[in-house]
From Swiss-Prot:
Main location: cytoplasm
One Gene Ontology term of the molecular function aspect: GTP binding
Record's keyword terms, sorted: Cytoplasm, Elongation factor, GTP-binding, Nucleotide-binding, Protein biosynthesis
Species lineage: Bacteria, Pseudomonadati, Campylobacterota, Epsilonproteobacteria, Campylobacterales
SS bonds (residue pairs): none
Family: Belongs to the TRAFAC class translation factor GTPase superfamily. Classic translation factor GTPase family. EF-G/EF-2 subfamily.
Name of the molecule in the record: Elongation factor G
Amino acid sequence: MSRSTPLKKVRNIGIAAHIDAGKTTTSERILFFTGMSHKIGEVHDGAATMDWMEQEKERGITITSAATTCFWKDHQINLIDTPGHVDFTIEVERSMRVLDGAVAVFCSVGGVQPQSETVWRQANKYGVPRIVFVNKMDRIGANFYNVEDQIRNRLKANPVPLQIPIGAEDNFKGVIDLVTMKALVWEDDTKPTDYVEKEIPAELKEKAEEYRTKMIEAVSETSDELMEKYLGGEELSLEEIKTGIKAGCLSLSIVPMLCGTAFKNKGVQPLLDAVVAYLPAPDEVANIKGEYEDGTEVSVKSTDDGEFAGLAFKIMTDPFVGQLTFVRVYRGCLESGSYAYNSTKDKKERIGRLLKMHSNKREEIKVLYAGEIGAVVGLKDTLTGDTLASEKDKVILERMDFPDPVISVAVEPKTKADQEKMSIALNKLAQEDPSFRVSTDEESGQTIISGMGELHLEIIVDRMLREFKVEAEVGQPQVAYRETIRKAVEQEYKYAKQSGGRGQYGHVFLRLEPLEPGSGYEFVNDIKGGVIPKEYIPAVDKGVQEALQNGVLAGYPVEDVKVTVYDGSYHEVDSSEMAFKLAASMGFKEGARKAGAVILEPMMKVEVETPEDYMGDVIGDLNKRRGQVNSMDERGGNKIITAFCPLAEMFGYSTDLRSQTQGRATYSMEFNHYDEVPKNVADEIIKKRNG
């Protein structure tokens, strides 16, 4: 069976944006104009097709990436919806991994928001080419050129407008296309799908010429050939301009900018034309890196030939079909009814039904080809980030990095009967979301759930109730503290026990040294002359790692330490792995007590946008929460305060901020780094932990 859309004509794109920049509306309009959905869904009434989980409808924010297939001018566009809320950056990371290009949506009034910076950084990390759509041009305060400046100054990118707006706010009529030098005007609001090409209005001619010159300059820098032509005073042809824009976009040296208002249906068709013209096909982006089990690196090219290789990037539980695993195929093809090999887990998987999703309608298909995205029903062992491959070529594609959770709460089912239902629900949710963890507190026996922020955990508890009908009582949020050491020490420890018959003997000298924040744990074997036999060294490492689980101050995990074993002794008969493990573990604990152990806490980067009248109150409150104000800025008449605050002091912040500013301030918060806890606070924590 051959593919219906050639690889060259496939586009895998994501729509990335800050909350309320109009991302879901833009996705909806794309589906509308590509003819897939007949009635446009509005986020305001909670009816958008892309937002298909209950909580999103209520909160009006997009949480899970649904992958949707649509068609525009004989191209297949696979649209991956990315969430804009900061607690869901893991979802964004995950979708960035499988995108080839992105449309970054900015609000013409709000411009570059803190979350836009996070998403932009992630797109840079994965080298995703993008085009910018400045949305909401009909709103009061709309300013296309401000957004252009912010992209240049705050995101350090090189924005190149391919359009400039005709009017703004209530007078927004359309755009001037700088490539063709025509005005595209939407004359009749009742027929949003129709626009007319006209001559450029006289009052905008000069501005259009100025911006076209800037565009041509940027385009000419994408190749020596175009540069020569441009410097020689020759006109660039339409074809050359388009080729230059695409080359600049793919090399990330320019970011093409367009504008419109998705809500009023203006500017969406030209945006789709730009997606097709300037964003890459799967075979135009860098090959994806992979490796074999023995560590040999290999590069996997997007092509129909060759053995199958794909990445599972999302797991969802669908009420009708059960578990869906979303897969991006990089090479070869995946057929329903066949087998694939999970090379990450070393297990064979049977491929049941294959579905292409249209936000929440499904189409059953027989084959997924290279470059395509679809969902597989019924995989048993495959989790997010696993590679599926052919048994003949067991490649493992790049692994994804998932952050460690920073906040935990204890949950208990309201009735004992729900205990098992709750465990099943939490395990399913943990399979879908690698940044969410479930564990059991060994002392209290309580179930602990951990995630990336308060909202993240609220939504998990909410989903338990809605999807699994489990009502849960939620405890007080707990912060994920850590411990570390501040000075280097050397520690000897001898573990010797004689209890009739064979004894136990392990003897080590350890050097403990603090490392830079974020370095984790490093183990060095510096044993000379076999004073501790080689086979016992892994046991020493293991003993230290076990001791790291419970720090000496308050039992929190220890990080950022380097431990060197440099001397010791052993006994021919009595030494064992167990003895060395215990010697290392106890030796580390004794050493840590002398090494200036301190407690670390997660610091959040908090950005508050507030009207000036409330600025004093907001800053005063952040100081009370042990926050350090880092910078102050202005945006759209409001003050922007950036601060680093301990997570422990930020619980319930949204309610407090609302009451301080009569609901007029907004904030965003994301984990930034770990920092030492002040002595008085540390004493409190230790007292509480050690009872």
